[in-house]
């Protein structure tokens, strides 16, 4: 049994389509079919039910799938441990982050690549729910996101920095002179909100759940960078974390004066999992970056 056969089986099980799986794996469809057949012959079971229109997992396939995932994960851990034992950072580091972390990460990404040129970085910007799913499936080594409103089974969250939910306006907006802003003050202006599912939107809805102000929502967007461009060129108000506008010119973040408006920036890791040295190094550099400049949590050096 070879790891590539298990990788092929997992991809077919995920996509339930040989053509799509072969493209995703960058191999020919005939090679993919051959690898699946060899795996079935070696295990002496049928893993996939095929017909001209669809592919589905057999009972044996359903049983093998989690074992195949675990085998590939264990193989990856083995490789990472060997690299770490050689005291030479190498290999691949997969990082998941919510969109609001993009401006915070720039400095650390550049520093890390200079210090560790043999480590390839894969950065995935997605929603919190998508990232937590990737973390549980070992598709990313760590997730950078604000502290979620609910607990995720098997995931531990460590605070990197404290932050607040804020009204974001351009420098010439009437609210720009404020040090803080109330919900009733925000209600006087047209609002462009981040889309539902994004962390800032979730945090805002939690804050306003105890109030009954009416907001003039004119627009919803799932792309933070476009949202900020609109704010710079109009009198719209948006709601994001303060950290989102790190290194952004022409806009101001005004903390919202309301209970539960805190947003803690966190690194999320799987419990009881091997932690790559490269992952810990990345977290250390991030903690020491100008974008955060907060104390390193004790867990990092344990």
Please place each PLM-identified region on the residue numbering.
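Short helix-boundary/capping micro-motifs
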Residues: 10-28
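N-terminal winged-helix
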Residues: 30, 34, 80, 86-116, ...
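A short LG(V/I)-centered, amphipathic sequence patch enriched
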Residues: 40-59
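Alpha-helical linker/hinge and terminal dimerization helices associated
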Residues: 42-43, 64-86
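Short beta-strand-centered segments that line the small-molecule binding cleft or hinge
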Residues: 107-111, 129-165, 169, 232-233, ...
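Beta-alpha-beta core module
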Residues: 152-158, 162-163, 225-274
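Flexible hinge/capping segments at coil-to-helix
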Residues: 154-191
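Secondary-structure junction motif
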Residues: 190-211, 275-283, 289-301
């Amino acid at each position: 049994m070879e790891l590539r056969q298990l990788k092929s089986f997992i991809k077919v099980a995920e996509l339930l389509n040989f053509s799509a799986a072969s493209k995703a794996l960058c191999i020919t469809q005939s090679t993919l079919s051959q690898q699946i057949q060899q795996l079935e012959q070696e295990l002496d079971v049928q893993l996939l039910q095929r017909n001209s229109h669809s592919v589905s997992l057999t009972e044996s396939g359903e049983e093998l799938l989690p074992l195949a995932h675990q085998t590939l994960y264990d193989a990856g851990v083995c490789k990472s441990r060997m690299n770490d034992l050689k005291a030479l950072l190498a290999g691949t580091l997969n990082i998941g982050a919510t969109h609001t972390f993009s401006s915070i990460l720039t400095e650390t990404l550049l520093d890390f690549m200079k210090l560790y040129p043999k480590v390839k970085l894969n950065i995935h910007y997605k929603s919190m729910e998508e990232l937590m799913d990737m973390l549980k499936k070992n598709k990313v080594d760590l997730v950078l996101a604000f502290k979620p409103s609910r607990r995720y089974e098997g995931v531990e969250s460590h605070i990197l920095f404290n932050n607040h939910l804020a009204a974001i306006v351009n420098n010439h907006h009437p609210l720009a002179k404020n040090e803080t802003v109330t919900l009733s003050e925000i209600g006087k202006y047209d609002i462009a909100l981040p889309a539902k599912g994004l962390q800032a939107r979730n945090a805002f809805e939690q804050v306003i759940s105890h109030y009954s102000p009416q907001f003039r929502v004119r627009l919803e967007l799932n792309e933070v960078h476009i949202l900020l461009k609109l704010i710079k060129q109009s009198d719209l108000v948006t709601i994001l974390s303060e950290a989102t506008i790190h290194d952004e010119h022409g806009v101001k973040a005004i903390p919202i004066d309301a209970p539960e408006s805190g947003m803690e920036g966190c690194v999320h890791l799987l419990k009881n999992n091997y932690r790559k040295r490269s992952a810990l190094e990345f977290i250390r550099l991030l903690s020491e970056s100008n974008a955060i400049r907060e104390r390193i949590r004790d867990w990092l050096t344990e």
